């Protein structure tokens, strides 16, 4: 597994010197009073050296040294704005509206891109024209910026996602084509405080399969300002409501099966012993289920990027 990742990173360094025309990537960082980690976030982007990048930082009216940090990197980013907004997703909508890149993604102000992450993204979308959105290996980063956990490569399916398996798509590692963004409505919902990414993924799944990439792209930083246990409970509850509404859009046997499965999951949740058995048997079974929308994994081999079916 490690050898695959190392070969991928090396190949991107070679590609960087090859004169290849890279797709334009539009990346946005929303921030509010982010002085502790923002500089590391910006550096993880600009130090990539990706040659066709639109990078916008959107500040929500910070009162600490955030603006000073942004100004320090004015010459290395595409632009920035500072004004009050209606939450993170409103800030992201403002940022994306100022970009034209054909590939899109965002990076929160405490998180990091992995080395050559943008070259990985650009080369995949350039090589695999049928792929519309991707996510890298789920990765956790310590408060000091060290990668501390790299999870196995999940395979994604809309059916399993709506059933409750594979719930957490790591946003820091997720990128998509602008055409998919536009088909899905062209904006993030500002109705939510923390669940707007989940709601966007639900809309993306209506139009395209999500492909995992067996490579490191970005990482989520664990720190004191991350979601607390109580906030996580609210996040899960709101995501469950979003998924339930999406299931209602379906028809026939698929809708009936998903509703029954979700009902059973809720019914056993208050019973610890039964819940444990359900999670071991039913939920693990979902992870291994090959649905019709089960997406191949993207891997790098001797001849470049390929889909492993």
Locations of regions flagged by a protein language model:
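Conserved nucleotide-sugar donor-binding catalytic segment
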Residues: 27, 97, 150-239
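Membrane-proximal basic amphipathic "stem/tether" segments
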Residues: 1-6, 244-309
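Acidic helix N-cap motif at the loop->helix transition within catalytic regions
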Residues: 36-39, 64-72, 116
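A conserved acidic beta->alpha catalytic loop
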Residues: 51, 59-68, 108
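N-proximal low-complexity "stem/linker" segments adjacent to membrane-targeting elements
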Residues: 1-47
